[in-house]
Design a protein with these regions (language model features):
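Short, flexible segments with low predicted structural confidence
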Residues: 10-11, 31-33, 120-122, 146, ...
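Short active-site-adjacent helix-start/loop capping segments
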Residues: 37, 138-139
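Generic alpha-helix structural propensity
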Residues: 23, 34, 38, 55, ...
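Pre-Walker A-like glycine/lysine-rich segment at the N-terminus of P-loop NTPase domains
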Residues: 1-45, 65-66
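Short amphipathic alpha-helical segments enriched in hydrophobics
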Residues: 43, 47-50, 179
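Ordered, soluble secondary-structure elements with a strong preference for glycine-centered loop motifs
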Residues: 30, 139-140
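Nucleotide-state sensing region of NTPase/ATPase domains
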Residues: 48-137, 143-145, 149-161
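Long, non-coiled-coil amphipathic alpha-helical linker/lever segments
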Residues: 2-23, 150, 157-190
Length: 190
């Protein structure tokens, strides 16, 4: 699989970009602060439906666009080994505020081949692996960093894995909550 086309509208520092990509190695080069990392972030967002860098996804909406119509659109078209195309489209917007005391409502819509999909079903439609300087913590950091990295990779490859992982995390949260209640004397051990 390779990404054959990328469209970005109001994403980070990009107002409107259309890129056609060829199979094989692609190198993006340029001066600092020109958007190379932003371009890679957009590709990663298409693969995993969430940003690798933004703590708040509202931050990916281009600042100038946020003043007018606060939205961003990223579309990626990938060509699979069997020559079938897959298109992932992610639209993010901030709805207008109801009054001056509230922030706008953030909305994210994901489509795969034109059909609306929840994030868990869109993960892996376009496969990507991002390795950055921050990922050195995979070597120096705790095992939880390595587990999370492997979870991200496996979620793209195996659709059932992400469902099982989500269920496992839910069960672990319930277990931890129950253990806390037992420790506090608010629940019995049976």
């Amino acid at each position: 699989m390779y990404l054959s086309h990328l469209t970005m509208k109001n994403f980070r520092n990009y107002a409107d970009v259309e890129l056609d990509l060829s199979p094989g190695l692609t190198i993006f080069r340029g001066a600092n602060a020109q958007g190379k990392s932003n371009l890679l972030e957009a590709i990663y967002l298409l693969a995993l439906t969430k940003s690798a860098r933004a703590h708040n996804e509202r931050d990916v909406i281009r600042f100038e666009a946020a003043k007018q119509t606060p939205y961003t659109r990223i579309i990626g078209t990938a060509l699979q080994k069997n020559n079938q195309q897959v298109e992932v489209r992610i639209d993010m917007a901030i709805a207008p505020r109801q009054d001056a005391s509230t922030s706008g409502i953030y909305q994210k819509r994901i489509r795969v081949n034109g059909l609306p999909k929840p994030a868990s079903q869109a993960v892996g439609a376009i496969a990507a692996v991002l390795f950055s300087a921050d990922d050195l913590s995979l070597i120096t950091g705790p095992p939880s960093y390595r587990r999370r990295y492997m979870d991200v990779l496996l979620s793209q490859v195996d659709k059932d894995y992400i469902k099982t992982l989500q269920r496992y995390l839910q069960v672990m949260a319930q277990r931890n909550q129950l253990l806390k209640r037992i420790r506090e004397g608010k629940a019995g051990q049976d």
